């Protein structure tokens, strides 16, 4: 084969292999002598776990947590106070404050203006492991309903 012809092909092949484009670049024609270059994909970013200090929640995570909190306080019926029936002095007892097992109102963002029945927000006592007392049905200081 003529060496001049192969030199021309070699130059053309070198030019073809230098065509940029990365992953989705132009397809190299093997018949023309082009050699595909090794493609370097960008490194996959590792997302930190929720227990990591570098973890930042996505909007989806925030929405999921928000839905869980809303469901916790709105889907379950709130407990009401007990009314006394068939008990001696029932009318007097019903006029008094009666105990409610769980805190019937949320402890965060308590609407203090609208609620004349509850003069101050309910106290949620911290237990030994730091969970709010409403999880354990513990009674607390101001959980009374009229």
From Swiss-Prot:
Domain of life: Viruses
Cited function: One of the minor capsid proteins that constitute a network internal to the major capsid proteins and outside the lipid membrane. The minor capsid proteins glue and stabilize the capsomers.
Record note on quaternary structure: Interacts with the major capsid protein.
Location of the protein in the cell: Virion
A GO cellular-component term linked to this record: viral capsid
Keyword Lipid metabolism part of the UniProt annotation: no
UniProt source species: Paramecium bursaria Chlorella virus 1 (PBCV-1)
Lineage of the species this protein comes from: Viruses, Varidnaviria, Bamfordvirae, Nucleocytoviricota, Megaviricetes
Identification of the protein by name: Minor capsid protein P5
Chief location of this protein within or outside the cell: virion
Upregulating conditions: Expressed in the late phase of the viral replicative cycle.
Keywords from the named record: Capsid protein, Late protein, Virion
